[in-house]
Curated annotation (Swiss-Prot):
Effect of G292E: In k176 and k169; Impaired DTC migration and loss of gonadal basement membrane localization in 20 percent of mutants. Pharynx is elongated
Assigned keywords, A-Z: Basement membrane, Cleavage on pair of basic residues, Developmental protein, Disulfide bond, Extracellular matrix, Glycoprotein, Hydrolase, Metal-binding, Metalloprotease, Protease, Repeat, Secreted, Signal, Zinc, Zymogen
Post-translation changes: N-glycosylated by the COG complex; required for gonadal localization. N-glycosylation of the propeptide is required for gonadal localization but not for distal tip cell migration. Required for the regulation of pharynx length. N-glycosylation is not required for mig-17 secretion.
Enzyme Commission number(s) of this protein: 3.4.24.-
Outcome of swapping E303Q: Probable loss of catalytic activity. No cleavage of the propeptide. Loss of gonadal basement membrane localization in 60 percent of mutants and abnormal DTC migration. Pharynx is elongated
Record's GO cellular component terms: basement membrane; extracellular space
Name of the protein: Metalloprotease mig-17
Amino acid sequence: MHTFCILIPTFLVLVWTTESARREKQQSNDISFVKRKVQDGLKFSRVIKYTNETIQGMKTNFNSNKTQELSLDVLVVADFLSYQAFLEMSNGDSHRAIHNLKEYLHALFEQTKIIYDGISFGNETLHMVFAGTWIATQERDCPLWISWAEEEEERVLNEEIRRLEEKERDLNSTFVDDTFFMNSTDSDNSSTDALISSDMPKKLRKFVDITLEEMQENNSTEMTLKIDSKKAIDKFTIWLKEQTGLPRHEHAVLITKFDLISINGNSATQGMAYVGNICENGDSSSVVEDIGAGLTSLIMAHEIGHSLGALHDGAYETAECDSNDNYLMAVAVSGSADRQSFLNSRRMSNCSINSIIENLKEPTANCVKKWKTKKGKDVSQKDFIKKPGELVKITRQCQVAFGPTFIPCLHIGYFHEQSICERIWCSDGESDECQTLNYFPAFDGTECGYNMWCLEGSCVQNTKKWMDCKDINSKTCSKYSTSKLKHYCKSKDFREICCRTCAKKGKIY
């Protein structure tokens, strides 16, 4: 009984003391942290108090060692058809096929990264980070896998469409509403804007995308399998949301050998993405038809641009930017002998840049903004990163575009080492006929001469070679004058002996 009477007032005193302390803490706006430690079964507590000045100092110290940058982690996914194509190129060796395909996907990413490294968004650059790859080695694992029920449903739908078309021809009439709908989803038409206006829900902002003029009809799998482009992006989005074991990423790109078909049935569409849905789970994605190497990476960069918030140049909201200027976000990208037009294909117009800057201000795009610890420039690490053309040689670039038997065209009328940087010509090895695509530049880093490689469509000196080779006899190599080296370094045998010396002087040969 006595214990009960004693405990009550003690309890009340404790409550009053805690409440009083809370009020005092609120008034002073000080923050206290309790550090607890257990040693030999005994618990110790240490209260550490911080004032506003202390906290501000901590923030200052934190920020002084940190910097915010734009960074995007990109996952590259290959479908089953892509795997089959590389299996054929690897003579049925599955291990080699997977290895080669991984290198190809990495090369596509590196080329896309190079493109974005050259674009400034205000005072910032968007740094692409390679999140990894995922390859569908079985048909059932493919993100675009179509079940028997879906195939039957599509067959019935196609039959119905053909029936309606025949009826339409018989009646010699036009369905205005259907025509408008077809136009408003097909990237060949300016009225695409109807589905991407700012007052539309994001889920409806789907973009049937980039088209390429005068495309070759055949490539490594002859594009015999087709899929509706809208269905492709929808299936890929659902697939991404269902997967639990994928590498962590903020945008996913599906590389497919399916021929992407627009709603009106043509195959000019080469990619599709949601507009402005960067960072959104599953919706931050794009589907890219694998036309071939440098061209595929350009489409990939284009689609990521849409996801970041860019519209097509020349659209209603971007009317001041002419699509004919051939910038990255043009409706149709084409190859051109004009140097500036070629360079524009790797740049963004002011309209695209401004659209992306505005979209990145949205809270939904916060995943792109990251705090990084300040570090000194590590030039050596950057120098040792392989360029896409080092990962995938020119022969493989031909094979991906046209088939496993194709090699670079050596016909004197087509082949000039330096010209491959802007356009590669290929032949199947059994005929003199050479083929190319309307836009088919070599990957950056593709060899285009002795100690030369392709950068931005130009064949330039490969300074990286200086680090990769050494003179066998440096004393002998250093005794020759520049005029003599100019002559001697043309010899392959001499170059092998004086590799580093000839590499340094390579620009004069």
